[in-house]
Amino acid sequence: KEHMSELYASKYLSLYKDFTARESKALLMDDSIFFNPFDFSLIVNIDSQIVEKKMDLVETFNTLKGIEVEGIKLRYFEDKKYIFVDGKNEVVIWREFDKESLDIAKELDFIKENCDITKELYINGITQTHTKKELVAKESIFELRALLVEGVKIDE
């Protein structure tokens, strides 16, 4: 499992490792690019060609984190798409969100109805919308950044 995560990270990250450290750091620090994780792309270097490549954040996170996926379900809340990834020991929630229009209390109820919150939770944008008292969850974007940076030496 760990070997596959390392192999995937190495292959995937090699697509953009030639970009400058400043650009890589900026990419990893801008939370707004993850507000719609279902329409995410990167400008990458493939065979000396600069191209835009769609990135599946759900699959990338599952693979890099080594999540043993037991099920995936798609739900909609207030016309926004949510994907719940049910892992053996964790639940990962990916969602489109706009914190200005989100009813946080209703979303919290929706999340509790759709997953086992006794498992370890990862949610994109959790720090933007919920307090730690409302829902104990890890910010998936911070975790994804850590996994990506682990595989690429962006300070070189």
Question: Which stretches of residues belong to each language-model region?
Answer:
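Accessory, often C-terminal, charged low-complexity segments
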Residues: 1-156
